[in-house]
Regions:
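Conserved catalytic core of nucleic-acid polymerases
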Residues: 47-48, 53-55, 130-265, 269-272, ...
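Short beta-strand-to-loop capping motifs
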Residues: 279-283
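Charge-dense polyanion-binding interfaces
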Residues: 4-29, 115-134, 299-311
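Short amphipathic alpha-helices in soluble, non-transmembrane regions
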Residues: 290-297
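Conserved "right-hand" nucleotidyltransferase catalytic core of DNA-directed polymerases
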Residues: 1-75, 89-91, 101, 161, ...
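A structural signal for short secondary-structure junctions
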Residues: 85-88, 262-265, 270-274, 291, ...
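Function-dense linear segments that define catalytic or interfacial modules
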Residues: 49-136
């Protein structure tokens, strides 16, 4: 039985939590604990392969082994992350883009309400909830924000009312009303998503902000459910692909920064996880360099005059991956 289905009924029988725990333990053991040590080289490090063409959206994929899916949510998974440590005299720095897909959607669509939220520096889910529910930003409740978060992420993947109902945990009538109000509030975003679908139907592909194409052959399928899947791919590809473009520009710009500052022996990019870059840095310069690297990430679009929408990144320093 699918894990997600077992999660829904885990309180209905005392054996189900044990089944879930067993599955987690066997997964951790086979995929990480037993396997990862076999990839360690003589220098004590794992040298994975990052594949430029491993994803249709332009994101890197990682293999031998895949270091982009090291567990992060569970307590046991966090212990696996703690095994990835900085070298002697070094520390790890994580620079993580904040809500980059939604920022990409704001840039591509030009939706005034979404752009306003980011330019004001408001939490995007709080800002969304305030505008959909018609309250001030400081009056948004945690439940309102939770519902806004469900649709913010889902809408970029072609989410409909049925999926929104499940994500919000409400009756269909309430989900429909919320969906309709969201469409009204962020009308330009919704128009843009429809335009993307129409473009994909006409030309067979979509493009990112920097021009990366994603072919959508499923739109030609004789099967309706595959055509619907093709539409969801068409909607998401420009947004997720633009996010991938941005992180790759950040990789280029941070490399330039390191070279210009002559820090190539002190700062090294060691891991890329979609919207996050992980560096290994000499401990004595970590604090000052961390802020400068964040500034580099935040300027990748503005310095190229591609967009004036604020792109924000956060940073965390720590001795291992669990901490950051």
């Amino acid at each position: 039985t699918n894990v997600s289905e077992l999660e829904k009924i885990k309180d209905e029988h005392p054996s189900i939590p044990y089944i879930l725990e067993y599955r987690e333990l066997t997964k951790l053991l086979s995929t990480y604990i037993d396997t990862l040590p076999t990839y360690v080289k003589d220098d004590g490090r794992i040298h994975a392969h990052f594949v430029q063409t491993g994803s249709g959206t332009g994101r890197f994929s990682c293999e031998d082994p895949n270091l982009q899916n090291i567990p992060v949510k569970s307590e046991l998974g966090q212990k696996v992350r703690s095994a990835f440590i900085a070298g002697k005299g070094k520390t790890l720095l994580s620079c993580d883009y904040a809500q980059i897909d939604l920022r990409a959607a704001a840039i591509l669509s030009g939706d005034e309400n979404l752009v306003e939220i980011f330019k004001k520096g408001i939490d995007v889910h709080t800002g969304t909830a305030a505008r959909v529910f018609g309250v001030k930003d400081d009056k948004v409740t945690s439940d309102m924000r939770r519902k806004a978060k469900a649709i913010n992420f889902g809408i970029l993947y072609g989410m409909g009312v049925t999926s929104l109902k499940e994500g919000m945990g409400v009756e269909r009538k309430e989900a429909q009303e919320f969906y309709d109000q969201y469409k009204f509030t962020f009308s330009r975003l919704m128009e843009y998503l429809e335009e993307i679908k129409a473009y994909a139907w006409k030309y067979g592909y979509t493009t990112t902000l920097l021009g990366r194409r994603r072919e959508v052959p499923l739109l030609k399928s004789p099967l309706p459910f595959l055509r619907a899947q093709g539409e969801r791919i068409a909607i998401n590809a420009p947004v997720q692909g633009t996010s991938a473009d941005i992180i790759k520009l950040a990789m280029l710009d941070t490399a330039d920064y390191v070279n210009e500052k002559k820090l190539d022996n002190k700062v090294k990019l060691v891991l890329q996880i979609h919207d996050e870059l992980v560096f290994e840095i000499d401990e004595d310069i970590a604090e000052s360099i961390a802020d400068e690297l964040v500034a580099v990430l935040e300027q990748v679009l503005s310095k190229r005059k591609l967009s004036d929408l604020p792109i924000k990144a956060s940073r965390t320093l720590g001795a291992n991956l669990q901490i950051i």
